[in-house]
Regions:
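Membrane-interface elements of multi-pass transporters and channels
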Residues: 31, 35, 88, 117, ...
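Intrinsically disordered, low-complexity regions enriched in proline, serine, glycine
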Residues: 29-30, 36-37, 140-141, 169-173, ...
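N-terminal TM1-TM2 helical hairpin plus the immediately adjacent luminal interfacial "cap"
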Residues: 2-102
């Protein structure tokens, strides 16, 4: 148990909470401690001001004989690509990464209201994977059966794979569209047109200030809660600097890839 706890606490903070909630809520629903009916996001529930539904609809997934494997694949992609983004492109900038998730989640909630989508786990994970792939287009990734290709094609391979094997693809398309929306407004438009369309709200820097990663023996050390609190005195400076833009460039690394 100590090893599991140590591994879990080594996950960067935003990915850790997302990963943990994506395990806890489905398991609690499966064993009957939470009513799955109250987890789904429905338009009628929102009209009744059941405002927790967009949150539970993001973390809950119905686990059963026909969905268990897909759920595990979701957890794998969540852990792998969220962690890769948070420890590479967004390293030292947890507020910026959280804002990316909030942006993608908000776009998906709006789509879900108009399209009667009940669960958001699949498209949100795909949106994060898409952003990582766009920021690491030329990286060679490995897929099933030893196939290898550039990262920019991975979202489309997953879309085709699910369409062929599962007859689905709708959630993958939503995830790709959402990820592309964020990538366009955050990276493409400022690069091609100049000026930023979105910036991280200053309030997020108050709770998640930027920090300088500490490196020792080749491993990335994340700050403790006390060290984060000690940096909050300078959070306002970080937020004012960050509002003028960030250099989020960098190169991710696929676990299990090349």
């Amino acid at each position: 148990m100590a090893e599991i706890k140590q591994w879990f606490m080594s996950i960067p903070i935003i990915t850790r909470y997302w990963f943990g909630l994506s395990i806890a809520m489905p398991v609690l629903g499966r064993i009957g401690l939470l009513n799955p009916y109250h987890m789904f996001m429905t338009k009628d529930a929102l009209w009744r001001l059941e405002l927790w539904r967009p949150f539970t609809g993001t973390f809950y997934y119905p686990i059963g004989p026909g969905t268990g494997f897909h759920y595990l694949i979701n957890l794998y992609f969540l852990y792998q690509y969220s962690k890769n983004l948070e420890t590479n492109e967004f390293v030292g900038k947890p507020a910026d990464y959280l804002f990316m998730l909030i942006f993608n989640w908000s776009a998906l909630v709006l789509m879900a209201v108009f399209m009667n989508i009940f669960l958001l786990m699949d498209p949100l994970i795909l949106s994060v994977l898409y952003v990582w792939c766009q920021l690491n287009k030329e990286m060679i990734v490995s897929f099933w059966f030893g196939t290898r290709f550039k990262a920019q094609f991975l979202p489309w391979v997953l879309l085709g794979f699910n369409m062929i094997l599962g007859g689905g693809g709708f959630f993958e398309i939503l995830g790709i569209l959402t990820g592309h929306l964020y990538y366009y407004v955050k990276y493409v438009y400022p690069r091609d047109q100049g000026g930023e369309l979105i910036t991280t709200p200053a309030i997020l820097y108050r709770f998640l200030p930027n920090y300088t990663p500490l490196r020792s023996t080749g491993f990335l050390s994340f700050p403790t809660a006390s060290s984060i609190r000690s940096q909050r005195n300078t959070a306002s400076n970080d937020s004012s600097t960050s509002s003028s833009g960030h250099n989020w460039g960098g190169r991710g690394h696929v676990l299990g890839g090349n």
